């Protein structure tokens, strides 16, 4: 790895490494690195290693590291007012960000905002709203879904058992439906999108008939693109069918756009591409480019069913975080921003589709998928029989690819119980930087 000047001294690095032993073991991480600086698509470790970042802090730093507009907004707001608590009074950034978000909502019915700090908290807020508004209890989530690690959000999460291991019993009233995803069904032959949609709808009907009656079901929560479950776009026809089912039975449809929101999929929200209106939209991650901020947005008629005091939090809608969110919103409105996302998406997908068909990897890469700059690459693996028995693949191939990329100063992440790597670069990544990243990985 190449080093740069100005890195920490050996004594400082030693002290930092000693501090690692006092960090809670329950935190999982994909490397033992210590980052000190970031700029655009690059990060530097304390010992001076420069690494190309295709993780964006797990889809958070959408505008790249230390974006000047965001940095300026943070400094300016911090010099005026950092915190008062939304439970005491409004702040100007809170109200200004509310106005900016409502202008870009995928449906005008989404007209009322509640800010919180993290994606998990926003999911909890959505559950509370759904139960109050419908006067029903049960929630349906999806196999492979990830909604967070707090108590209720953890109960909805079905991507990996590690997130709830040892913490049962969890929040009751949660039921699980299959997501329309071929690997989740264990299909040896890829099914068409229509076949997956019909199979998943049939299983959802069975869930209603056998486990949770529609009259007991408050909400269905779904990610328009499955995140931790493998970066799998949900078929629009399935989402449209969900909308009809929810309307028929007074069930609220919740879209968890924590990871897909704010330009990640090539539009402001993935909801725009589906053509389906959610009752509650959950946002976080890219909303403030790294500062803790999340939101749920719904109809005023639903939000007004909650009595004052039933939602809130000491830090929710923090003034500095909202100021960062305003800067993000302004940058995303600049001419050419979304065009760059589309161009870089095509650049990555073209290379990956060619790689999938190359003799070296044919039969090993089984799928290249995603939307915008939310890209998943799935390898064959031992969880199910190989599609090509003449080319058996080793166990843990995704993790091995990740390790090899790290050795070449390229930081990527794996995801799901299947063999999937995910590429989530900053949305401001240039064509030159994209080509450089692909060269680093020999893509």
Regions found by a protein language model. Name each.
Residues 2-443:
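Conserved N-terminal phosphate-binding loop of PLP-dependent enzymes in the Aspartate aminotransferase
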